[in-house]
Amino acid sequence: MRWVGPTTLVVLGLFTTGWSSSWDSIRAAARDIQSIQAAFTQEKHLQILARPLQSHGRLIFAAPDRLRWEYQAPLPSVLLMDEGRIQRFVKTGDSWTEDASAALPAMSFVMQEIGRWMNGRFDDNPDFEARLEPGGKIVLTPRQAALATVIQKIVLQLAETPGVIDSVNVYEDDHNFTQLHFNEVAVNQPIDPALFKHHS
């Protein structure tokens, strides 16, 4: 087996984690991001279920504050954030209906948080204490007891590509959590602004 010296290991470490080594470097990488498009797979693990609930869809982000979070299956729906306005639409049969239910404020909170992440501002929300760990891992823990009853912690894994998130785990408690994995990521490709407006 070929011997790898300590200098080589240091160089490899800088190559793979350099952009995620500090909050400043993360924000600097995010400033170079004009758009991100990615497919995602979501698994919701509940203690009462033998198998996780699976769904998949697409994420589209355009700096600084436009976001489209679309579930394509099994239940089609889309969340849109366009210059501060947040809307949700659900598909029933062949038609789309805007959802103005009581759950929308919680979804707005999530969309705004994702918007911060896309801009590299992981430590910018006063509701969470942010900790940056080696290897590009970020751990967010609630500061207030009320929020901690809903979210125990959020763990994000940054990708090797600067400005990109590889996965997100949202823990409700030790036994129930939601896992998101991103793939087919395209950075700084042209995006039609109409994608952030819904035409039902």
Named regions from a protein language model:
Residues 54-56, 74-75, 82, 149-153, ...:
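Short, surface-exposed coil-to-beta transition loops
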Residues 1-8:
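Bacterial N-terminal signal peptides that target proteins for export
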Residues 122-200:
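Gly/Pro-enriched, hydrophobic low-complexity segments
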Residues 58-110, 178:
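An acidic-aromatic
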Residues 47-51, 78, 146-149, 174:
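Short glycine/serine/proline-enriched coil/turn segments at secondary-structure junctions
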Residues 21-46, 50-52, 90-145, 199:
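Flexible, processing/modification-adjacent segments and terminal tails
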Residues 40, 67-71, 86-89, 139-140, ...:
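Short hydrophobic/aromatic-rich beta-strand segments that constitute the beta-sheet cores
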Residues 11-22:
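Bacterial Sec-dependent signal peptides at the C-terminal "C-region" and cleavage site
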